[in-house]
Each structure stands twice: as structure tokens, then as C-alpha cells.
A protein has these predicted regions:
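N-terminal secretory signal peptides that target proteins for export/translocation
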Residues: 1-3
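Sec-dependent N-terminal signal peptides
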Residues: 5-20
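Sec-dependent signal peptide cleavage junction
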Residues: 17-32
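Propeptide-to-catalytic entry region of secreted or membrane-anchored zinc metalloproteases
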Residues: 30-156, 163-166
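Active-site-proximal segment of zinc-dependent metalloprotease catalytic domains
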Residues: 74-79, 89, 146-219, 224-231, ...
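Stable alpha-helical elements in mature extracytoplasmic
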Residues: 97, 101-108, 142, 196-204, ...
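Short, solvent-exposed loop/beta-turn-alpha elements that line the ligand-binding surface or hinge
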Residues: 232-237
Length: 251
């Protein structure tokens, strides 16, 4: 990735560890200062409470189609299917926690991809796996680690890193690009089988250039932190933006 030619905003889901009882509860707002990672690219800090990892492993059944479709969306009826390729990367902590990490992460990604397929005919295809070492001191610098290794590749549309590094204090973090990059880069924390697919769909949406909805706005959308762990679709404005960017990736 040529950093001199591209201004990249980092949209980070700083899902801080706080007591969590209901996914419908409005996110607690915490003010933090803008910070920077080694690349000197700006990090937009917009925190969201991190849900505690589900104690019981939730079966990875598909999302119910009735819970994905937004009645205000019509894009799924118009667009031809577009397939995007995905490389899954797992760091040392994630691999240690999940010996079956390849099959697990594939299922998590495919579940997250249902919303993209149902609403926008974007088909997620996991085509390869790799390992990586998360050396960063916080969430943003760990994302930078992954980007350093894979940000310039054009072999995959998306590179999704999975981490269980204790220095990663977010539930997910991703680069939000102003135009099509060589590859979309994101890192997802291990939130368990229940909540991880929500984090993936949120961060991949950032890779497509989608910003957040304002907390407290009442807008039901996966890009609104108030509904990030309960909603599997986009609001009308994000639907339109995603549709306009769908050709950034895939074939």
C-alpha cells in the first residue's frame, strides 16, 4: 500500500471491557484523545464497550434471514453476486486458545458474511490461512503489525486478523479507506462464537468506507454502537454507500 498516495482513516471499535448485561443497552460513552500508530496515520478513537466473551460456546448456526433483511433495502434484488476472497490470519495467542482455529474462524467469517450476501449479494470466500505475530502495544499498533505484513498484497480482497493478545483492548479495529485499497485489513478480538460475527461484519463495513452512526440516534444499524451486537443489517444511508463501494473488492 502506498501511504503517500492514500489517506487512510482508522475506524476502531474500542470495545472496552466493562460489565455487560444486555446487548440492547446503550453503549457507555467514554472520551479518549486522538492517538497515532507508528505509521503516523490518524486513529479515530470512538469507543464502544466490549462485551464479555460468552461463557458457553454458542453453536454457529446461520443468522436467521428474517433478522438480516432490512425492509427498507432493495439492493439485494438488484446486484449480481460479487465474490470477495479472504485470508484469515491468527496470532500466537489466538492459536494457543483454539487448536481448531482454522475451522473456527472460517465459520465465524462465513456467518458474518451472511448479511453482505443477503443484502448486497457479496459472497465471502475464505481461501487461505496464515499465522502472524502481534507485537503492538495497543489495538491500533497491532492492526499496524498486520498491515505491515499484508497491507500491500493484492492476492486477497480482505485480510482478517484474529487475536487474543491482552494488549488488544478493542473488540475489533479496521482501516476505513477513502477508495479501493490493495486489500482491506482488520483485526478482531476473540469475543466467543456469539459476538465475534457481529464484530467482523462491523469492521468489514469499515473496510468498505462506512462510518459510524451516532450513538443515541436510535438508528438501528450494525454501524451504530448501540446496536452493534444485536443488529445484522445496515440503515438506508449505509446500504447506499456500501452498494456504491461494492466493486472495491472481488470479482
Amino acid at each position: 500500500m502506498n501511504l503517500k498516495r492514500m489517506i487512510i482513516a482508522l475506524a476502531c471499535s474500542a470495545l472496552l471491557l466493562v460489565p455487560f448485561t444486555s446487548i440492547s443497552t446503550h453503549a457507555q460513552e467514554i472520551d479518549i484523545h486522538q492517538q497515532s500508530i507508528p505509521s503516523k496515520l490518524p486513529v479515530i478513537g470512538d469507543p464502544l464497550p466490549k462485551v464479555n466473551q460468552d461463557k458457553v460456546t454458542t453453536p454457529l448456526h446461520p443468522f436467521s434471514p428474517s433478522n438480516i433483511k432490512n425492509s427498507n433495502s432493495f439492493f439485494h434484488t438488484l446486484a449480481a453476486t460479487r465474490t470477495v476472497t479472504i485470508l484469515i490470519a491468527a496470532d500466537e495467542e489466538y492459536r494457543a486458545a483454539h487448536p481448531d482455529w482454522k475451522s473456527l474462524t472460517k465459520q465465524l467469517v462465513e456467518k458474518a458474511g451472511q448479511s453482505f450476501l443477503t443484502e448486497h449479494n457479496i459472497q465471502f470466500s475464505v481461501v487461505n490461512y496464515t499465522t502472524w505475530k502481534s507485537d503492538g502495544y495497543d489495538s491500533a499498533s497491532i492492526l499496524y503489525d498486520l498491515n505491515t505484513e499484508w497491507g500491500n498484497t493484492s492476492s486477497y480482497d480482505f485480510v482478517i486478523g484474529f487475536t487474543k493478545d491482552t494488549r488488544f483492548t478493542a473488540g475489533g479495529i479496521a482501516y476505513m479507506y477513502p477508495s479501493a485499497p490493495p486489500s482491506g485489513i482488520s483485526v478482531i478480538f476473540d469475543l466467543g462464537t456469539l459476538y465475534t460475527p457481529y464484530a467482523i461484519q462491523h469492521e468489514i463495513s469499515h473496510n468498505y468506507g462506512l462510518p459510524h452512526d451516532a450513538s443515541g440516534s436510535g438508528i438501528k444499524c450494525m454501524m451504530n454502537y448501540d446496536y452493534a451486537y444485536s443488529v445484522k443489517y445496515w440503515d438506508a444511508s449505509h446500504d447506499a454507500l456500501l452498494e456504491s463501494h461494492r466493486n472495491w473488492y472481488g470479482y
